[in-house]
């Protein structure tokens, strides 16, 4: 029984997703339905959490919009998520960056990860 469920879940999982980690700045293209038409809306921010659960994986992106912090959680393999683009890699030493919620301005910056030679 569980083999059937596992096979169905693997069939629905997206394979074209880039590798990203907490601290990375990403642009998530989200499908937004307005009336009878559909368009793409970009949500750019820092990944503060990733939850790896196969088909039920999710990640949280945080951005500052008009001086107000906005967080949005996306299901990784959802049909609403059109694409994910990694803008820059962040060098962090935590899996969950919830401490960024209390910080603003320069203290909320994340160092850029340098490429290995």
Curated annotation (Swiss-Prot):
Tell me which Gene3D superfamilies the record gives.
Answer: 2.30.30.790
* SUPFAM superfamilies listed in its UniProt record: Translation proteins SH3-like domain
Pfam families named among the record's database cross-references: Ribosomal_L19 (PF01245)
Q: Which PROSITE patterns match?
A: RIBOSOMAL_L19
InterPro entries named in the record: Ribosomal_bL19, Ribosomal_bL19_CS, Ribosomal_bL19_sf, Translation_prot_SH3-like_sf
Domain of life the protein comes from: Bacteria
Family named by the database record: Belongs to the bacterial ribosomal protein bL19 family.
Function of this protein?
Answer: This protein is located at the 30S-50S ribosomal subunit interface and may play a role in the structure and function of the aminoacyl-tRNA binding site.
**One GO molecular-function annotation for this sequence?**
structural constituent of ribosome
Where does this protein come from, organism-wise? Vibrio campbellii (strain ATCC BAA-1116)
User: What name appears for this protein in its UniProt entry?
Assistant: Large ribosomal subunit protein bL19
* Keywords, sorted A to Z: Ribonucleoprotein, Ribosomal protein
What processes in GO biological process is this protein linked to?
Answer: translation
Please name the HAMAP family in this protein's record.
Answer: Ribosomal_bL19 (MF_00402)
Question: Got a GO cellular component term for this one?
Answer: cytosolic large ribosomal subunit
